[in-house]
Amino acid sequence: MNILRPPTSSSSSSFPPYPKPVSLTPPVSFTLIHNPINLCSINPPFTNAGRPIFQRSASGTANSSAEDLSSFLGSPSEAYSTHNDQELLFLLRNRKTDEAWAKYVQSTHLPGPTCLSRLVSQLSYQSKPESLTRAQSILTRLRNERQLHRLDANSLGLLAMAAAKSGQTLYAVSVIKSMIRSGYLPHVKAWTAAVASLSASGDDGPEESIKLFIAITRRVKRFGDQSLVGQSRPDTAAFNAVLNACANLGDTDKYWKLFEEMSEWDCEPDVLTYNVMIKLCARVGRKELIVFVLERIIDKGIKVCMTTMHSLVAAYVGFGDLRTAERIVQAMREKRRDLCKVLRECNAEDLKEKEEEEAEDDEDAFEDDEDSGYSARDEVSEEGVVDVFKKLLPNSVDPSGEPPLLPKVFAPDSRIYTTLMKGYMKNGRVADTARMLEAMRRQDDRNSHPDEVTYTTVVSAFVNAGLMDRARQVLAEMARMGVPANRITYNVLLKGYCKQLQIDRAEDLLREMTEDAGIEPDVVSYNIIIDGCILIDDSAGALAFFNEMRTRGIAPTKISYTTLMKAFAMSGQPKLANRVFDEMMNDPRVKVDLIAWNMLVEGYCRLGLIEDAQRVVSRMKENGFYPNVATYGSLANGVSQARKPGDALLLWKEIKERCAVKKKEAPSDSSSDPAPPMLKPDEGLLDTLADICVRAAFFKKALEIIACMEENGIPPNKTKYKKIYVEMHSRMFTSKHASQARIDRRVERKRAAEAFKFWLGLPNSYYGSEWKLGPRED
């Protein structure tokens, strides 16, 4: 019996073929035309310079005969009704997309390429979730029948864009990659949507975004005649998307290389490019350079927009510098144009404060390099960052000139105020958050009035402070003010109830959200309430909500699976956690990460099933994942639970090798297997291992672990180890009836025990005195 009930579907698979989208933004700015772009083959014909590039048009015409279409598809035995195709095409040309879909569903034959491509295009172009699902179902059918070649590049590109804008990043990327593998280049707007969606996603999304951008631009460069691929060449928007990925990673070198590459494609940086640069400065901790990005925009004559102001305030709030953020908002309220001057003054004040702090700490500046955390490598890295910003912002090298003025006055809007309010919320300033809301209500400018994001921020502030009644009052006030609460607002409230272990009230809110507000819960809503069930040890409830989510057609995310695994692991049901893990592995929409592996290891280790846990770790390594501190911590606890100190020695050996990775220099090593990353153990891991070794009388290994703790700045719990030694080993090596052979064998162990007693401060042979509990003999 499968504990994870699949959602109701005609498919026999445990998972729906594609996730149901939550929402779609307004129609994308992509011209819907009947004649699609040409598909350019990018397969190996480029090796022969004299050979013409193969091109074929996937566009059909309304007058195409059945024989022509059959010949084009390469399947002369296939028959379909030309009359039905004409009716379908008539509906599509008149923008009767829903009627065309009904006609397609009722038809028993597969329409021709023109009808299919146009139907997918128009469904993708609509801003309705069900339309995207319909378009995806057509693609699924064609894939199953091996007829994907019936769709043209325009329809696939629109489908990828719609999927990206609805949050289905992996689906959008898979469509783009499928086009590339088939030898076709997607339209720049289509692949830019995928790159942008990846750059903003979590995990390794930004890295994959950069890889996708490079892969496409390399293929475009292969064409000698660039006019053939003019619609696939990257534009400024494409570069902004990949630069955003670099900013999210804090990778200044890649940012600079791609920024320089813009000129090769005749692309000029725009205001969004520099807004992304503000984010880059924030990610790498270069707060003092933000003002020079703004000055660079003004000096280059680029039109400053309100999004730049948003980026500035968000950057300073992210640094926790609410003082500067408040000054920006105040300058905007006073209709000042000398914002650059204000920011330079803030930089000068920060520099002065930093110099004063350094003067106070001057006596600590000459401590040992290791103690202070200083390394030459860190200095080189910092210097590299400085050099990149000197190229990106040459105006920052000599900022002695007069700061430029803004081209016009910008008044703060609700987003500016809300961003500042989020800073108050993160700092626990609940009263300031509430006062800001009241001040926004009194603004004359309607653009400054609070919106649903503002109210949600206030709700978050009260929830974080544990004031759930006040948070519900804000929700009621939103209804009175005519500001509809959104899904995020309800999710914040759900999280608050779950944190306070009020799962019943969370369930009531979930029903209220659906029935009264008409807002369907999403995967985040269910993840929150599943996690709440874990907090009250209700694994059955967690499973029930997981199955309810799938029944509603909501695709589980990585967090959904790992949260359910946590429920079973915490309740002592590792086999059920393993079954959830297997479902996760088989779900193509989810990428298994180290957290999921660790949760599986934790489930077995909690019961002392160390052999099962070790098998999971072996599988993990085979799949390219290296154990981290959490993995080793679970294993150490499992060894302690199973009372197998011998396994602790093997575990310590592996950890010791991982800790020494950075110290080993092997620049010319030609090994095919990459070395595992360096491990920095924490107090919990080392303390558990030391505890096991002391109890098992492995004093030499215990001293090694203690030395490792001291190297990593972790104070050993000497009192605890002394108590263990006195209780368990105080009479060790005191037998007078041991044979000489036995005495000889334990010489090394006795020496280690004496060294350990010396470290504990107990009487030992190093003092030349006997350890006796009785009165001292003079």
From Swiss-Prot:
Domain of life: Eukaryota
GO biological process: mRNA processing
Gene: HCF152
Organism annotation: Arabidopsis thaliana
Lipoprotein in keyword set: no
TM annotation in the entry: none
General function of this protein: Involved in the processing of polycistronic chloroplast psbB-psbT-psbH-petB-petD transcript. Could bind RNA.
Residue ranges with Acidic residues bias: 355-372
Family named by the database record: Belongs to the PPR family. P subfamily.
PPR repeat windows: 235-269, 270-304, 305-339, 413-443, 451-485, 486-521, 522-556, 557-587, 593-627, 628-658
Keywords: Chloroplast, Nucleotide-binding, Plastid, Repeat, RNA-binding, Transit peptide
An MF annotation (GO) of this entry: nucleotide binding
Protein name (record): Pentatricopeptide repeat-containing protein At3g09650, chloroplastic
Region feature (Disordered): 351-381
Annotated transit peptide: 1-65
One Gene Ontology cellular component annotation held by this UniProt entry: chloroplast stroma
Chief location: plastid
Subcellular location: Plastid, Chloroplast stroma
